[in-house]
Amino acid sequence: MEPSISGHAPAPARIRSAGHWLRRELLPVLALLLLLGTARASFANHYHVPSGSMQPTLQPGDRVAVDMSAYGVRVPFTRHVLIERGRPQRGDVVVFDSPADGTRLIKRVVAVAGDRVELRDGHLSINGVPMADAADPQAERFGPRVARLDLANGGGPDILDARVPAGHVLVLGDHRGRSVDGRWFGFVPVDALYARALAVYWRSGDGLGWRRL
């Protein structure tokens, strides 16, 4: 009697075939997802603005594109810098971890290491030079950048005289009277800066766009 011939491959062959399919089809997809996740954690991301502390520059609910490699390429999900790049500059809008409780915030760098800072009635002076824009007292000029201020609720606490220590920056909100910022939690270590904000890419009522910061 001749053995019967089944139309199905033997079980070991089916297992080998399934394993080959997984390696050929699934592993590249997993590798791509891992690559995208790593890129998101190390290079580009977005931030959802939770409050009005940066008005009028940023509105509550704004979606902001950020460059996570602006100050260095890090090991994903850590503060360890693999490749150093730029240093924070006055006027940069940055996302960082609060020294007080680790909450992720977005504010403006107004002073860097070595700067002497005074803030009176919401108006900033760096190294004895007022930052107010000559054409608009409700704005401050940081080189080519102009930051619009909201002083409708006053300027908040003053800074009478302070010097930024090495490896740190001072951050303030553009809405000076309603911002919990460096006046409350002190100077921010540079390695706590998570990203530099590039642009608002979505705003309620306006929809998609690219409003550069």
Model-derived regions: residue spans:
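Soluble "head" domains of membrane/secretory-pathway proteins
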Residues: 2-25, 38, 42-213
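Single-pass alpha-helical transmembrane signal-anchor segments
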Residues: 29-39
